[in-house]
Amino acid sequence: MTGMKMFKLWMVVMLLGLLPVVSEAQEEINNAINVQLEYLKKYPKDKEALRKVSFLYLNKADYDQAIFYGRQLFEIGYNERDYNGAVIYSHICLGQAHMMKGNVKEAYSHLGQARLIGESNKNDSALCSVYNGLGLYASNVQKDYYRSLTYFFKGVEAARRCHYDRLYS
């Protein structure tokens, strides 16, 4: 067997070995989503459950559902004037979901709103995600790698301020 054929065979074996891990992770996300959806049947205006399910759908790459639940979170948060909680996290989720769908204007608008709320309230935990999203936007949409790095370092600094060791070490 030639070296290239051996390499291809090795790659196939490795990829097949990863399938159970990917499948298991997907199953965990689906289970977590189902738990939140069941909870929302009883408590449809629970902001924490809406936040969790919207981000779970975002992690699952089901951007339409992330947007659906992110909008609900926004409406409830806005009506309750929960800007530094429900509203900021809805903007983060909506911004990232719209970016992944290619809706760059909406993505930038939501991330910009989240940034304003986060910076005015010194919400470093949320700013980690905001700066990450803005950095991805700068890199992938604007092709402005300097700005992307600036956001990356702002995110690292925000992570340091809120003691997210895993994010800045």
What name fits each language-model region?
Residues 26-169:
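A "functional boundary" signal
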Residues 21-25:
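Sec/Tat signal peptide C-region and signal peptidase I cleavage site
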Residues 1-11:
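Bacterial N-terminal signal peptides that target proteins for export
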Residues 10-19:
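Bacterial N-terminal signal peptides
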